[in-house]
Amino acid sequence: MIKLEQICRYVWINGDLIPYQFARIHVLTHSLHYSGSVFEGERAYNGKVFKLKEHTERLIQSAEALGLKVPYSVDEIIKAHEFLITHNNIKDAYIRPLIWCGDESLNITNPALSTNFLIASIPSMPMSCEQGVNLHVSRWRKAMPDSTPVQSKSAAQYNMAITSKKEAKALGYDDALLLDYEGFIAECTTTNIFFVKDTTLYTPIADRFLNGITRKTIIEIAKNLCLEVKEERLKLAQIEYFTGCFVTGTAIEVQNISSIDLGDKKILFEDCKIADLLKKEYLRIVRG
């Protein structure tokens, strides 16, 4: 396995460019103990970050939802990205901006806590799987939207996703399908899900989970290709009537789903034509 120190030269922290091996935080960092950090996952294609403004605006909104004050403007954050990409000399990169609280206090809240900002970039790694992905339905449910800021991309939101994926992997699956608190289909652990029937896409309403930037892009592409898109509450019992299924995300882009195991039966998806068409158009757009 390649270590990050082998592929990441510099990290941008609080306005300074720091060699990877010297980028450190204290063990008593507040966000390390209380999951009080927010982040983004971004992709650069040929040196240009796709939808960087949208990612940056969402990052700031995520921080504000947790009461974190971001000391940089959208334009300053964009320039920091460009600065880091140039110095790391990586054209196709996965980029991780992160905002977190410092180590001034371990109290749950304290006005003395500092807000810190990091941007890291590493070469993009192949994430998609040509033969498709097999899903297991997780026993864990997404939280109610009035119990946590679901549109905030915060570290705390990923605890259940990590647990669900670990359990799915241990059972021999590739990933987990997550349901919301009412038992409707929500998303996968780090991706948004779509189903296909003829020339119509079906996808859960994004009010109970993070509305992905790639998800929104794919919906826009689909409509431009004269495909119908229906956003609605979807039950597990409905999925056997769909012929195709795929997921979307910044890292994975567009990935076909081969099967979803419901426990009493496994639903197979063999129609990849729509997903392949959308992926082809998506890659054309991001690579400009």
Curated annotation (Swiss-Prot):
It is an enzyme of class 2 (transferase). Pathway: Amino-acid biosynthesis; L-isoleucine biosynthesis; L-isoleucine from 2-oxobutanoate: step 4/4; Amino-acid biosynthesis; L-leucine biosynthesis; L-leucine from 3-methyl-2-oxobutanoate: step 4/4; Amino-acid biosynthesis; L-valine biosynthesis; L-valine from pyruvate: step 4/4. The modification N6-(pyridoxal phosphate)lysine is found at residue 153. Its cofactor is pyridoxal 5'-phosphate. One of its GO terms (molecular function) is L-valine-2-oxoglutarate transaminase activity. GO terms for cellular component: cytosol. It comes from the Bacteria. One of its GO terms (biological process) is isoleucine biosynthetic process. Its EC number is 2.6.1.42. Pfam families: Aminotran_4. It catalyses: L-leucine + 2-oxoglutarate = 4-methyl-2-oxopentanoate + L-glutamate; L-isoleucine + 2-oxoglutarate = (S)-3-methyl-2-oxopentanoate + L-glutamate; L-valine + 2-oxoglutarate = 3-methyl-2-oxobutanoate + L-glutamate. CDD domains: BCAT_beta_family (cd01557). Keywords: Amino-acid biosynthesis, Aminotransferase, Branched-chain amino acid biosynthesis, Pyridoxal phosphate, Transferase. Acts on leucine, isoleucine and valine. Belongs to the class-IV pyridoxal-phosphate-dependent aminotransferase family. This is Probable branched-chain-amino-acid aminotransferase. It comes from Rickettsia typhi (strain ATCC VR-144 / Wilmington). The gene is ilvE.
